[in-house]
A protein has these predicted regions:
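Short, charged, surface-exposed hinge/linker loops at domain edges
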Residues: 2-4, 45-108, 114-122, 140
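A short, exposed loop/beta-hairpin motif centered on an aromatic-Gly-Thr core
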Residues: 24-35, 108
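Short aromatic-glycine-(Arg/Gly/Cys) micro-motifs in beta-strand/loop hairpins
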Residues: 9-23
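Short, basic amphipathic alpha-helical segments that act as recognition/interaction helices
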Residues: 126-140
Length: 140
């Protein structure tokens, strides 16, 4: 499922961009606008995946017209920004997690010869059985 939240982009004096998400009180940055956009997607995805993992609710997305980058910057003590904008960032947190967090790792295991032979004879996928057993054990 896609989620959409507003992000405030501030251009820094050195040309880099700071990005703040008012609904989460998290921030990221990028070397240029393209990098900042990519980092904003990653930041939002990480935040949503973390909330979901912890069983915490997602905050309600603020309407774009209620987000005030000037007031937010002044509240942080940064003064009035000269170059800024608000943009909506959209991310499918589940899909992002699958692509970036659910990578497989190779594990070696030791089992008795007789068990190995029986499993091979039945065409059992060792990786799948191990994953299923671990998932079941971790949910218990």
């Amino acid at each position: 499922m896609k989620y959409v939240y507003p992000a405030m982009f501030y251009k820094e004096e050195d040309g880099r961009y700071s990005v703040l998400f008012p609904d989460f009180d998290v921030a990221t940055c990028g070397n240029d606008l393209n990098d900042a956009m990519n980092m904003a997607v990653e930041c939002l995805a990480l935040q949503l995946v973390g909330l979901k993992r912890d069983g915490d609710p997602f905050p309600v997305s603020s309407p774009v017209d209620t987000v005030d980058p000037v007031a937010y910057a002044e509240e942080l003590g940064a003064g009035k920004p000269s170059d800024y904008f608000v943009n909506l960032i959209s991310v499918d947190a589940d899909e992002y997690a699958k692509l970036h967090f659910n990578k497989s790792v190779r594990k070696n295991l030791t089992i008795p010869v007789w068990l190995n032979e029986k499993a091979l004879a039945q065409g059992i996928n060792f990786s799948q059985v191990l994953q299923e057993a671990l998932m079941e054990r971790l949910q218990a």
